[in-house]
Amino acid sequence: MYFDRTKINVESMKQAILERVYCGVVQTPQSASTRDIFTAVAKTVLEWMAKGWLKTQSSYYDNDVKRVYYISMEFLLGRSLKSNLLNLGLLDLVKEALFDLGYDFDQLVEMEHDAGLGNGGLGRLAACFLDSMATLEIPAYGYGLRYDYGIFDQKIENGFQVESPDEWLRYGNPWEICRGEYLYPVHFYGKVKHSIDSRGRDVAELVDSQEVLAMAYDVPVPGFNNDAVNSLRLWQAQSRHGFEFSYFNHGNYIRAIEDIALAGNITRVLYPNDSISEGQELRLKQEYFLVSATIQDILRRYTKTHLSLDKLSEKVSVQLNDTHPALGIAEMMRLLVDREELDWDVAWDATTKIFNYTNHTILPEALERWSLDLFSKVLPRHLEIIYEINARWLAKVSQKYPGDNDKRRALSIIEEGSSKFVNMANLAVVGTNKVNGVSTFHSQLIKSTLFKDFVEFFPDKFINVTNGITPRRWLALSNKKLSSLLNRTIGTEYLTNLTHLHKVIPLAEDSGFREEWRNIKIQNKEELAARIYKELGVTVNPQSIFDCHIKRIHEYKRQLMNILRVIYFYNEIRNGSGEIVPTTVIFGGKAAPGYAMAKLIIKLINNVAAVVNNDPKVNDQLKVIFWPNYRVSLAEAIIPATDLSEQISTAGMEASGTGNMKFALNGALTIGTMDGANIEMAEHIGKEHMFIFGLLEEEISELRKEYYPQGICNANPTIQEILDMIAQAKFSQEDKDLFKPIVNRLLNEGDPFFVLADLEAYINTQNRVASLFKQPEEWTKKSIYNVGGIGFFSSDRSIAEYASNIWNVSRPTS
């Protein structure tokens, strides 16, 4: 079935869905379950996309376009049914058709599991970028891994995070197409055998290696309101040998499937626990598996229409989303030199023109460094290649800085010392054409700190592309009421040019418009409150401030500071110290399985919630929610109902953030530090329409030299009281020592994320929030200004900048 937009109507849509019920899931409308109907609808939509998908890919070949390959360990897609229908322009028609057939569309949507392909902002950014690349008709492909169990399902048991498998593929993925014809070998371990060929070239061959196969699965990515459909290709690891029948026949059932299990482990879960050596090894194998299969596929596609590799760098641009795929640089060199027999200099020239690197962090633990022992064991040939890259690179460094060993050390890809490491960020800089940060502040920071020495060598390599979000999912899809109001008052152009939102700013002075705006927020809050009660059993007041802190749990994101503030307000209520504006504080986010402190912070939040929510003196003045298993589909419910967006990272540690943009797009006001994209948001929205507080990055750098957290407690009895309550087991009577690591972190381990340094300013700013919330007309004006000023932060704008300033690509001519 090919989708013809001009011929589709409710009746033809009903017929198409029923055909899939009968022929696709082999049920009758009477016997089909809700899941069957969801699958039938999804398969119908997939068939509607097929013609555009094929036409798009054909146009790339016909026009011999330069293609973009976006490689990422994460793609946090969320659910696809509503998003695909919205982009195809069929959402309302499908809803009507299903209603006529007697089905509830919202129930069908709930049948779809969020795709288990990501965890945090890195993956969600990649997903927004895929949407924008298709909408802008950029010839692009996403490449990632098809994880069997995602990162994990988060459950809360007795306040603790408990990880369980994310069974997102239990019922299959109706959006994927298995491409069995694209099966690539990927090799690990072994040893390198060198010989001289007839032309006198050194030939490297990996022998005695372990071979794993990469199987391709394609997921369509439709653009908004056009016929373009790009591809996200995901790799699944499979054993070369498969089921060992001889072992099975002799009763050795475990050995019979051992190879299948070991190979499959590579794509079993996202980010295996790297606090153990086995987890580190598996992570390295994951990253190499991704880039090896991807680059083999890129070369296959290129050589399909080109007889030589002369134009490879003119037709291919690869974007590395963080350092995880940086091994692709060494893999491209291996394939070009070892397999294609190019001279080293020719191969290196092509490679450094093809690859580009997006840096997402300056946090030391997130900048990948692989021990030489592990690297040489898993990827011996690639270590040789990296040594050669480094030797040639350091020769250039020595030419520019003769005798400067400190400069050589700083710029080396290999870190010397008692233990040696491969520095993947340095490899990513040396082996790429452009390096970009993801906010103006972050880009300045990496140039002045992390890559300062590289900037001296490559002054033109480093640029900025501020992150963005897709307004299709984060407004039109998730906040139908607000988008309908905007459509009616300022038109729909903002969906493809978000700067048109500025047209709403004059309406902030219209009292009738403000009332409509306010009523939409209240309705969204009432719906969320009902869901909180249904799923979590907690009654919250929709008239309270909905104060939301939903993101990955990490010390630098300072969920700890937020819960300390909650304890402060709890004490204020208990002591009767003045009027408190009713507040509902909502937390959500996952902690990495091996990150003990982050998991303990989750426990503290839940224990504080248990005390606060059950204290009759508090009543409805303060409620604390930790919503388990935070994910895209949950964010789509929380963000439209939020009044206050928590963006309170330690200044200098958040590269950009995109949650801040999503909240502002939905009319929430931001409380935040001058960090990441908050700084640019303040410029575009107006600092007066946000609640900015806290130390600046340069102030933190100075304070770090002589920071004494205990002195803050000595000077502020209120803060000391909060820590005493934690230390004295007010929130942990089952285990009086439970939260001592948190108190120690703050007082005895230097408070590395400056929680106590910013806490008083944070509390004072929260008091300003409460004062403004008591003035609904003024609050609503600022809410409108937030939406009107957020237009710069579209992923369409981000992708247009990548296309122009990094990739040098444009849409096909036909």
From Swiss-Prot:
GO terms for cellular component: cytoplasm. SUPFAM superfamilies: UDP-Glycosyltransferase/glycogen phosphorylase (SSF53756). Its cofactor is pyridoxal 5'-phosphate. This is Glycogen phosphorylase. Belongs to the glycogen phosphorylase family. One of its GO terms (molecular function) is pyridoxal phosphate binding. It holds the Pfam family Phosphorylase. The gene is glgP. One of its GO terms (biological process) is glycogen catabolic process.
